[in-house]
Amino acid sequence: MNASFAPSSSFVAGLRHDWSRAEIKALFELPFSDLMFQAQSVHRAWFNPNEVQVSTLCSIKTGACPEDCAYCPQSARYDTGLEKEKLMAVEKVIEEARAAKASGATRFCMGAAWRSPKGKDMPYVTAMVKGVKSLGMETCMTLGMLSEAQAQDLADAGLDYYNHNLDTSPEYYGEIITTRTYQDRLETLDNVRKAGMKVCCGGIVGMGEEVLDRAGLLQQLANMAEHPESVPINMLVKVGGTPLEREADLDPIDFIRTIAVARILMPKSHVRLSAGREQMNEQTQALAFLAGANSIFYGEKLLTTPNPEANKDMQLFNKLGIKPEAYDVHETEEEQEAALVHQLEEAKLDAFFYNAAR
């Protein structure tokens, strides 16, 4: 949160954790201009509306995931043509982080396609955290489910953020995933909080869900005892070979409504415009920023789907008068990072990238 845009006491007092599904549905049903005005008003009370947080993401282990998430090309259950890669060497990860820092990065996110890390993996991932932290960078990981002990190990290594998405509403969840329960996800988030790390948690829209399911997802997030510091809102990226490859496109206005409602419900969180941004034109992205999105992944790729080229991002920022949010080493409540250009993976994976942070 930008110190020069500190919220008023009335907005602080207005933070809620008791939203009903009916209240959230009513927000979704507001006339579009009214919803956008309300979201932008909340956004301006907490953030500089002309700054967007910029993140980068490195896949440290790609493919061969045993889960059956219907949207994800990293699942071993689907023939998507994605080539699996084993865990990246610690030295290589640190080299990637060093290159990212040289390009202006202040925060480095690492993702692995696992159901959960095995005991033999933990020394390597904690070494990655320590190595990246030694460069003076902020760190984030997404490795699947975590036990209390694993979460504590990551926290002890210095990990700042852990990403674990809920994906959708509790009611629709079974249509998308059967190999991991909703409660499994909530327990991992509890373990992350208990260990003292910050939470990055959101979901995916456009998977065939109803408006009530989007309301249900946001209700789960907004009614947590502490709002996630980062809330990624992903638009489904349809990848050939996955069960959702022929899913109907979500209307962009419905996507913008989801961003706006997320901003209203979670005023102090960074709302991240994440996967699916490549399919969005400049006008849709501009509306998303107006609705309260203030974080993006920057660079050529996410984990398994293409991402808009970095120079295009900066061109759009220039058109809109947006600047990358500066990182303040004295502020630890919210993610803060500067713009960066960083090659994330080999070109052979270009057709198969998707933000598989789960």
From Swiss-Prot:
Domain Radical SAM core: 50-277
Tree of life domain: Bacteria
Molecular function terms from GO: 2 iron, 2 sulfur cluster binding; 4 iron, 4 sulfur cluster binding; biotin synthase activity; iron ion binding
InterPro entries: Aldolase_TIM, BATS_dom, Biotin_synth/BioAB, Biotin_synthase, Elp3/MiaA/NifB-like_rSAM, rSAM
Cofactor binding comment, as recorded: Binds 1 [4Fe-4S] cluster. The cluster is coordinated with 3 cysteines and an exchangeable S-adenosyl-L-methionine. Binds 1 [2Fe-2S] cluster. The cluster is coordinated with 3 cysteines and 1 arginine.
Reported cofactor(s): [4Fe-4S] cluster; [2Fe-2S] cluster
A Pfam cross-reference name: BATS
Alphabetical UniProt keywords: 2Fe-2S, 4Fe-4S, Biotin biosynthesis, Iron, Iron-sulfur, Metal-binding, S-adenosyl-L-methionine, Transferase
Binding site for [4Fe-4S] cluster: 65, 69, 72
Enzyme Commission number(s) of this protein: 2.8.1.6
Protein family according to the UniProt entry: Belongs to the radical SAM superfamily. Biotin synthase family.
Function comment: Catalyzes the conversion of dethiobiotin (DTB) to biotin by the insertion of a sulfur atom into dethiobiotin via a radical-based mechanism.
Subunit (UniProt): Homodimer.
Protein name in UniProt: Biotin synthase
Organism: Cellvibrio japonicus (strain Ueda107)
This protein's encoding gene: bioB
